Amino acid sequence: MTENIRQIAFYGKGGIGKSTTSQNTLAAMAEMGQRIMIVGCDPKADSTRLMLHSKAQTTVLHLAAERGAVEDLELEEVMLTGFRGVKCVESGGPEPGVGCAGRGIITAINFLEENGAYQDLDFVSYDVLGDVVCGGFAMPIREGKAQEIYIVTSGEMMAMYAANNIARGILKYAHSGGVRLGGLICNSRKVDREAELIENLAERLNTQMIHFVPRDNIVQHAELRRMTVNEYAPDSNQSQEYRALAKKIINNTKLTIPTPMEMDELEALLIEYGILDDDTKHADIIGKPAEASAK
């Protein structure tokens, strides 16, 4: 059923622009004739909003809770069709502080598989929260669903820290589940030497920076209208960037087992590029009373 489908996943730190980047890229892939389904695996349920021009799609778990069981749902109730025929599903999650979102993800995926949602597709894309690759959010990797992982990051310290953590999670399941890292997507924050830094990080993680997405306010303008840039401004420079990334993913054959860094290695890299200051830079104030350093 899923033998010829490429099952990819976008992971990344919360707030990095993962859902925005993935939807814009998948919209460009759909423009190129690829048949795509998005499965949102983020409790915020915002993985399909730009495709559907909606606030948030009703989730599999929410409807299942209303009906009593996931078996009582019809596929058409949870799978909607968006921009360029992209199929859209949100797995949803439990109320904050209650239960495991990962269990909801696998429940939703199993329901989709059992009801024929994976037929006539070229790509299935999982959009996954990724500050921490806990057992729950690692579910698409752990269960062998997502085979090809793209990490959305930037030149900021916490985004790189999360990328390294996600690489560690991929490594854990690379041999048992066959999952591979497809590359880093740098969603620019206009950090100094950002492209060079992420290229260096990619090399250390045994992968590639598959694309550098420049920062452009047109992305926010499109988001306010609940649209992808490709639909809102198809001739813009930014839409061309997403099309370039889409082509690279479609043609990507560099799928690797990552080599995550130790924390001191990552910090040394950040110091080298001036993201994290060396203590010597502030030697005149470190360890002094507050009133002395304020003078």
Curated annotation (Swiss-Prot):
Catalytic activity, reaction form: N2 + 8 reduced [2Fe-2S]-[ferredoxin] + 16 ATP + 16 H2O = H2 + 8 oxidized [2Fe-2S]-[ferredoxin] + 2 NH4(+) + 16 ADP + 16 phosphate + 6 H(+)
Keywords: 4Fe-4S, ADP-ribosylation, ATP-binding, Iron, Iron-sulfur, Metal-binding, Nitrogen fixation, Nucleotide-binding, Oxidoreductase
Free-text function comment from the UniProt entry: The key enzymatic reactions in nitrogen fixation are catalyzed by the nitrogenase complex, which has 2 components: the iron protein and the molybdenum-iron protein.
EC number: 1.18.6.1
UniProt PTM comment: The reversible ADP-ribosylation of Arg-103 inactivates the nitrogenase reductase and regulates nitrogenase activity.
Taxonomic source organism: Mastigocladus laminosus (Fischerella sp.)
Protein name listed in UniProt: Nitrogenase iron protein 1
Cofactor stoichiometry and binding remark: Binds 1 [4Fe-4S] cluster per dimer.
Known cofactor(s): [4Fe-4S] cluster
Residues recorded with modification ADP-ribosylarginine: 103
Oligomeric form and interacting partners: Homodimer.
Keyword flag Iron: yes
One BP term from GO: nitrogen fixation
Chain residues that bind ATP: 12-19
Disulfide bonds: none
